[in-house]
Each structure stands twice: as structure tokens, then as C-alpha cells.
UniProtKB/Swiss-Prot annotation:
Main location: cytoplasm
Gene (name only): tapB
Superkingdom of origin organism: Bacteria
Protein name listed in UniProt: Temperature acclimation protein B
Keywords tagged on the record: Activator, Cytoplasm, DNA-binding, Stress response, Transcription, Transcription regulation
Induction: In response to low temperature.
Keyword Phosphoprotein: no
GO molecular function terms attached to this record: DNA binding
């Protein structure tokens, strides 16, 4: 199992339901609204600090 990492939201499009996170080290990671934990409307804001686990997706690594 991968370790939890920290990063910052680069951008997130509420209408499309996806965006990118810039980890503390390594390349930017794709993030989809279904991967966001919590109740209610799932969104992220630019500049928001987040923690995540990187996993292999269909097109590469994602949060």
C-alpha cells in the first residue's frame, strides 16, 4: 500500500469534476471528484493543501 503524501491543488474544474495536484515531490497528479473523501459536493480549491495516496490509473499515476 502506498503512503499518504501531501501536496497543493494546482487547479480543479467543478463542472468537469477533475483537476491536478502538485505533490511536494514529483510530477503533478490527476484527481477526479470520485477520489475526494467527504460528504456532500466534492470539490477542491486552487492552492488548497491536501493529503492523498498516489495510485496507478488508466493513464498514469493519480491521486
Amino acid at each position: 500500500m502506498s503512503q499518504r503524501q501531501s501536496g497543493t491543488v494546482k487547479w480543479f474544474n467543478d463542472e468537469k469534476g477533475f483537476g491536478f495536484i502538485t505533490p511536494e515531490s514529483g510530477p503533478d497528479l490527476f484527481v477526479h471528484f470520485r477520489a475526494i473523501q467527504g460528504n456532500g459536493f466534492k470539490s477542491l480549491k486552487e492552492g488548497q493543501k491536501v493529503t492523498f495516496i498516489a495510485v496507478q490509473g488508466q493513464k498514469g499515476m493519480q491521486a
